[in-house]
Design a protein with these regions (language model features):
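Preference for long, amphipathic alpha-helical scaffolds in soluble/luminal domains
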Residues: 1-197
Length: 197
């Protein structure tokens, strides 16, 4: 592999790129879901990208589907893991059509949409609603783009899966308005900071 050069069209029509990808697929196909945090759903996404949809993947997908009403965001909330679990389940459903995960997608999606701040962002803690019942501010060190973007992507993917919930469209709209502020100003910062240049 070290003696192979990348072709001018790399990664397309490139023997070295093809070899790297084939080797990566071998490694990914042998990995199991033993990690914590976002590592497992990201591994699941890598397996999906490699075309792996075996029983192990189905078992993992079903294992991260929360029962309806089981998420207690005021007690436990992890915006990163929730977002990546939902991205994985949505992509898994879109690729396989396995309806056994739709209730899980619905639960993650509704909880993430309800967790959003009035600006469409997520924080380290679940957003508490204001007295009138509308979304309040992100709290627990403030909002973070680093988890708000994956959560927003997961909500859009869930809608593509046919998941319906009254919070979905407003959540997409809130996040879109927030992120559009950064257009032509620089890259998205980690949290509520000036645009990165």
């Amino acid at each position: 592999l070290t003696n192979l050069a990348y072709s001018a069209t790399a990664p397309y029509n490139c023997p070295k790129s093809a070899r790297i990808l084939a080797d990566a697929v071998k490694v990914i196909s042998n990995m199991t879901f033993k990690s914590s945090g976002i590592a497992n759903p990201v591994l699941g996404l890598a397996k999906l990208a490699a075309g792996i949809t075996n029983d192990e993947l189905k078992t993992y997908a079903n294992s991260i589907c929360p029962a309806t009403g089981s998420l207690q965001p005021l007690v436990y909330y992890d915006s990163w893991t929730w977002a990546y679990n939902n991205i994985f389940l949505s992509e898994y459903f879109l690729l396989t059509g396995d309806t056994s995960v739709t209730n899980g997608i619905r639960e993650w999606t509704s909880s993430l949409a309800e967790a959003q701040s009035m600006y469409g962002t997520l924080g380290h803690h679940y957003t508490e609603n204001r007295h009138d019942g509308t979304h309040g501010s992100a709290w627990g060190y403030g909002p973070m783009h680093a988890c708000s973007i994956p959560a927003g992507i997961s909500i859009v993917l869930a809608k593509k899966c046919g998941i319906g919930h009254p919070e979905i469209d407003p959540a997409i709209d809130r996040l879109g308005k927030n992120e559009s502020y950064y257009v032509d100003k620089g890259g998205l910062p980690y949290g509520e900071h000036a645009p990165e240049l």
